[in-house]
């Protein structure tokens, strides 16, 4: 499955309800599983982003639907990056020879 890196920032509501952040992570894992996705790892971070989530999804459309659904809850916003594994990058590079 394609891999994604999500850079997460808390919105005001997410900060007000910070005590629930781990529970929200559990709920996100359950929702991802229902959608045929996998949250590989969650990290709460310091700096410009409050969290980094590594995910796998069957396709970009499913990933986009998940991100829109989570974002609509009002706790977080973020950026999603499509991440390429070594073998995928080798395939990409082979196309530019």
How would you describe each model-predicted region?
Residues 36-39, 75-77:
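A generic structural signal for alpha->beta connector loops
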Residues 57-87:
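An amphipathic, aromatic/His-enriched active-site/gating alpha helix that lines ligand/cofactor pockets
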Residues 43:
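Residues forming the ATP-binding cleft of Hanks-type serine/threonine protein kinase domains
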Residues 1-33, 38, 46-49, 61, ...:
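Short S/T/G/P-rich N-terminal loop/turn motif that feeds into the first structured element of a domain
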């Amino acid at each position: 499955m394609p891999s994604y890196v999500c850079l997460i920032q808390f919105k005001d509501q997410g900060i007000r309800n910070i005590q629930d952040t781990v529970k929200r992570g559990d709920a996100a894992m359950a929702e991802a599983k229902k959608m045929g996705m996998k949250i590989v790892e969650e990290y709460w971070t310091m700096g410009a982003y409050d969290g980094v989530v590594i995910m796998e999804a069957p396709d970009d459309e499913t990933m986009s639907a998940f991100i829109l659904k989570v974002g609509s809850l009002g706790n977080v916003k973020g950026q999603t990056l499509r991440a390429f594994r070594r073998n995928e990058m080798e395939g990409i590079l082979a196309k530019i020879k």
